[in-house]
């Protein structure tokens, strides 16, 4: 009996070690790459651009949170935290990949345009490599049997992370002067904010293992919210371009000017609308067409 009980435990320990060692090496690489990226950009100098601030925040956030994950796992403290650790690490890796993808595109194309500037080019390259490292982490985690366990590790959970991320890109691209002049644009900002708050709330409740305290079934709540979000974003897709570009053509001397931010918001609004439509279809299918086994 003793040998039969110990063997599965030993097998699980070996399996966990097989997974955790490559992940630890991968996370060390992620820390190094993101640290190099923000160090190189910081050494160049400060910029007042909101896109520069977003890129710096992305590199710093990913670097220090990945380092915190490593410390907690090496100290074996992750199991003692009152959170869903697998949900947390999976959703963070997904979010980090999205943030670094945005930073890898925004920084070389918007923040600087100096092909001969070695430090900026090197920062862009290391940012791209860090993005690839986080993508590998997401793939490795989801490929392991039994790793896709929590809500944030499922397709609807990852869509919630994507929706929150796209909303962040929208927020940093807003032009306050234009928004404050038109109630229609203010409605769009309210749509972005309300949908973002709910998605963020779902993520926080999931990581904090507090979804069980919800008096209503989670699946039905998600369906209701997703349908509402689709309707609100559908209005924003129409209203935003109408008021943002009415009597507001692109300036002739516009090179990375605020007008470009209006285009980014329009595009990202369409992206989030598609994400919420997919999320709604998936949620409706789970609630009404998939019978629990």
Describe the predicted segments one by one:
Residues 8-19, 41-55, 83-86, 111-122, ...:
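Juxtamembrane membrane-interface segments at transmembrane-helix boundaries in membrane proteins
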Residues 23-37, 41, 53-110, 127, ...:
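Signature of small four-pass
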Residues 243, 252-293:
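C-terminal interaction modules of eukaryotic adaptor/scaffold proteins
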Residues 2-30, 48-52, 117-124, 143-164, ...:
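Cytosolic juxtamembrane helix and N-cap/initiation of the first transmembrane helix
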